[in-house]
Amino acid sequence: MNLQNKILKGTTTVGIKVKDGVVLAADRRASAGYYVAHKYVRKVLYVTDNIGITTAGSVADLQFIYEALKYIYHRNSITGEGPITVKGIATWLANVLSSSKYFPYLVQILIGGVDDQPRLYNLDYLGDITEEEYTATGSGSPEALGVLEDNYKPEMSLDEAAELAKRAIFSSIKRDSFTGTGVIVTKITKNGHEEKEYYITKR
């Protein structure tokens, strides 16, 4: 199995950027091969109130990167350099991933947030970075992208984007055996984030 397949297997995450903010969403299943390792894993995390990430890939690598992102953000605030921007966070991480490409972190990460405007970035394990209007990662991304491409509109509201992200993940749950249990959807604005959880059946 190649590196890209290892990273893609086991999850679906979605990011959508609209004029009022950014929506991030992810399913909750963790799989090890064809085994469901955990049903309620958190794949939407927050660097600060108005910057979030979604995660796919090696749990150990993701934990290290998440703690590093929080450290960089808070270090800048403490040292008086001022809050780092969403673009700054994404660029810093892209440099870290690129410099480690011979011994790569096995991750695929979406970074979304709002400072002067909404921003959404997609980063792969080699440090390639793209700014997106909408995107999906993981083994269920083909199904999710189909829903996004058919329904995304730049002028849609944040609530409409959140509903679309939920639909995209649930579409993947129906078709992808590595995606499952439920969905976490968060709406991010410059004032913070609001998160909701949805499940196939009651917990």
Swiss-Prot record:
GO biological process per UniProt: proteasomal protein catabolic process
Enzyme Commission number, as recorded: 3.4.25.1
Family stated for the protein in its record: Belongs to the peptidase T1B family.
Major location category of this protein: cytoplasm
Active site (catalytic residues): 11
Organism: Sulfolobus acidocaldarius (strain ATCC 33909 / DSM 639 / JCM 8929 / NBRC 15157 / NCIMB 11770)
Oligomer status and interactors: The 20S proteasome core is composed of 14 alpha and 14 beta subunits that assemble into four stacked heptameric rings, resulting in a barrel-shaped structure. The two inner rings, each composed of seven catalytic beta subunits, are sandwiched by two outer rings, each composed of seven alpha subunits. The catalytic chamber with the active sites is on the inside of the barrel. Has a gated structure, the ends of the cylinder being occluded by the N-termini of the alpha-subunits. Is capped at one or both ends by the proteasome regulatory ATPase, PAN.
Reported function: Component of the proteasome core, a large protease complex with broad specificity involved in protein degradation.
Keywords: Autocatalytic cleavage, Cytoplasm, Hydrolase, Protease, Proteasome, Threonine protease, Zymogen
Activity regulation as described: The formation of the proteasomal ATPase PAN-20S proteasome complex, via the docking of the C-termini of PAN into the intersubunit pockets in the alpha-rings, triggers opening of the gate for substrate entry. Interconversion between the open-gate and close-gate conformations leads to a dynamic regulation of the 20S proteasome proteolysis activity.
Protein localization: Cytoplasm
InterPro entries: Ntn_hydrolases_N, Pept_T1A_Psome_bsu_arc, Pept_T1A_subB, Proteasome_bsu_CS, Proteasome_sua/b, Proteasome_suB-type
Catalytic activity: Cleavage of peptide bonds with very broad specificity
Protein name: Proteasome subunit beta 2
GO cellular component: cytoplasm; proteasome core complex, beta-subunit complex
Record-level Gene Ontology MF annotations: threonine-type endopeptidase activity
Residue ranges the record assigns to the propeptide: 1-10
